[in-house]
Amino acid sequence: MGEIIFKRTKGLTEKETHYCPGCTHGIAHRLVAEVLEEMNELDSSVCVSSVGCSVLSYEYFNIDAVEAAHGRAPAVATGIKRSISDKNTLVFTYQGDGDLASIGLGETMSAAVRGENITIIFMNNAIYGMTGGQMAPTTLEGQKTTTSPYGRDPKTAGLPIKMCEVLAQIPSAI
């Protein structure tokens, strides 16, 4: 009898993902689900996702999930964490860079400044992926997108936001 090399985590549903070929969201989902299972958190975690490629993550994670308005996942996660009776519940957001670093920048920064007891999983592909690959706030200098076919020019588009480095400067962000 052969050795079992891979076993599907209980943290994922059986549904096939809708992601584009080569996209890392499916791998990230598997890794998050495996960690939740390893930590025995599948029954005590809540995922909050919002508009963008992450919008359908509730279809794939086999845990409680909530969908937030565009960019508002940290605010919704904060509300859940503060109001839930079991304070050990792991509440996390799963967001892309367009959602987190653009329309949700204020919510992201505010949650960090307040030191909210939530986890934010940041999927940075440096473009707006769901709508066709347009330049995002995190698009790298010189990176070509559908709206910057010659590459991001800092003279006209500014420099990319380096969200992890920005958040690392906030003492209350854990």
Predicted features along the sequence, with ranges:
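Short aromatic-enriched loop/helix-cap "lid" or pocket-rim segments at secondary-structure transitions
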Residues: 132-134
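Generic secondary-structure signature for well-ordered alpha-helical cores
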Residues: 25-28, 37-41, 82-86, 113-116, ...
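Conserved active-site and cofactor/substrate-binding residues in soluble primary-metabolism enzymes
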Residues: 23-31, 42, 71-75, 106, ...
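Glycine- and other small-residue-rich loops at beta-strand/loop junctions that grip anionic moieties
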Residues: 21, 97, 152-156
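Conserved thiamine diphosphate
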Residues: 10, 136-174
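Short catalytic-loop micro-motif centered on adjacent basic/acidic residues
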Residues: 19-21, 93-95, 174
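Thiamine diphosphate
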Residues: 53-129
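Active-site diphosphate/adenylate-binding microenvironment
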Residues: 4-69
